[in-house]
Swiss-Prot record:
<dbReference type="Pfam" id="PF09637">
    <property type="entry name" value="Med18"/>
</dbReference>
<comment type="function">
    <text>Component of the Mediator complex, a coactivator involved in the regulated transcription of nearly all RNA polymerase II-dependent genes. Mediator functions as a bridge to convey information from gene-specific regulatory proteins to the basal RNA polymerase II transcription machinery. Mediator is recruited to promoters by direct interactions with regulatory proteins and serves as a scaffold for the assembly of a functional preinitiation complex with RNA polymerase II and the general transcription factors.</text>
</comment>
<comment type="subunit">
    <text>Component of the Mediator complex.</text>
</comment>
<dbReference type="InterPro" id="IPR019095">
    <property type="entry name" value="Mediator_Med18"/>
</dbReference>
<keyword id="KW-0010">Activator</keyword>
<keyword id="KW-0805">Transcription regulation</keyword>
<dbReference type="GO" id="GO:0003712">
    <property type="term" value="F:transcription coregulator activity"/>
</dbReference>
<dbReference type="GO" id="GO:0060261">
    <property type="term" value="P:positive regulation of transcription initiation by RNA polymerase II"/>
</dbReference>
<protein>
    <recommendedName>
        <fullName>Putative mediator of RNA polymerase II transcription subunit 18</fullName>
    </recommendedName>
</protein>
<dbReference type="GO" id="GO:0006366">
    <property type="term" value="P:transcription by RNA polymerase II"/>
</dbReference>
<dbReference type="GO" id="GO:0070847">
    <property type="term" value="C:core mediator complex"/>
</dbReference>
<dbReference type="GO" id="GO:0016592">
    <property type="term" value="C:mediator complex"/>
</dbReference>
<comment type="similarity">
    <text>Belongs to the Mediator complex subunit 18 family.</text>
</comment>
<keyword id="KW-0804">Transcription</keyword>
<keyword id="KW-0539">Nucleus</keyword>
């Protein structure tokens, strides 16, 4: 009986610890794009870096830290809204996002909404509201009817390493050629992102969780809190180059 109670207490403690970092996970399958979607406020907390050391050394460290590894390969398309108002007449009162990401992965369509990054001075991580939904090819017609057009696209290839609620991505970005195939690399070095999901009450714990793992990856890669406001300030004083610094792709 004592062993059972002890085991039960350990399970409760583990669930509580995980709940601090990830207070909820939202997922939904959309067969009809016009169906209403119900999802909680899920936030993606992340740190970013560029791998300048040999990838073999980094991968060895990542495998030692994480529980599982699997390849990542998909095509990301970003659609931009051309509607200046809140939306079409039949969607009066709704607020349409300025951008919607559509991901092709293993012949499956995933729709991803990514909110504007939140920069909180007392939290050492980037925070974004995210919604991921599995959809179908008909979603492209739905996007067109809503007034969205494709802005840019790129390929992503690499690996994802996971443990508990944490994911580590080591990826490269490639251009999309006119025939839809993969082109040359957009960056000399691989991009690294460490991320976990969190509810609104768990930002501080999630950031501490990320930075603890980031210390284990240093000096192989330095993962930092990316502040997009610095790019905006720099771009206001310099000519536009049409290059997205984070993703490394041309529009």
């Amino acid at each position: 009986m004592f062993q059972q109670n002890k085991h039960h207490q350990q399970q409760q403690q583990q669930q509580q610890q995980q709940g601090v970092v990830q207070s909820g996970v939202a997922s939904a399958t959309v067969n009809n794009p016009s169906e209403s979607i119900v999802a909680g406020n899920i936030y993606e907390c992340s740190l970013h870096g560029i791998l300048s050391t040999p990838s073999s050394t980094f991968i060895q460290r990542a495998k030692g830290m994480m529980r599982c590894e699997h390849p990542v390969s998909y095509k990301e398309m970003v659609f931009k809204s051309t509607v200046q108002s809140a939306g079409p007449s039949w969607a009066e009162g709704s607020i349409l996002p300025s951008e919607i990401h559509v991901r092709y992965e293993k012949n499956t369509v995933y729709v991803r909404y990514v909110g504007v990054p939140q920069i909180k001075d007392n939290i050492n991580a980037m925070i974004r509201n995210v919604v991921d939904i599995k959809s179908s090819e008909t979603f492209f017609i739905y996007l067109e009817n809503l007034g969205y057009v494709k802005d840019y696209e790129y390929f992503v290839d690499g690996y994802q390493y996971s443990t508990y609620n944490l994911s580590l991505f080591l990826v490269n970005h490639r251009r999309v050629l006119n025939d839809g195939t993969k082109g040359e690399l957009l960056n000399k070095h691989s991009m690294v992102e460490l991320q976990c999901l969190s509810g609104e009450e768990g930002f501080v714990a999630a950031a501490e969780y990320l930075n603890t793992y980031a210390e284990y990856l240093y000096p192989f890669v330095e993962l930092i809190k990316f502040d997009h406001r610095l790019l905006t300030a720099e771009n206001s004083n310099t000519p536009t180059t049409n290059v997205n610094v984070v993703g490394g792709y041309n529009r």
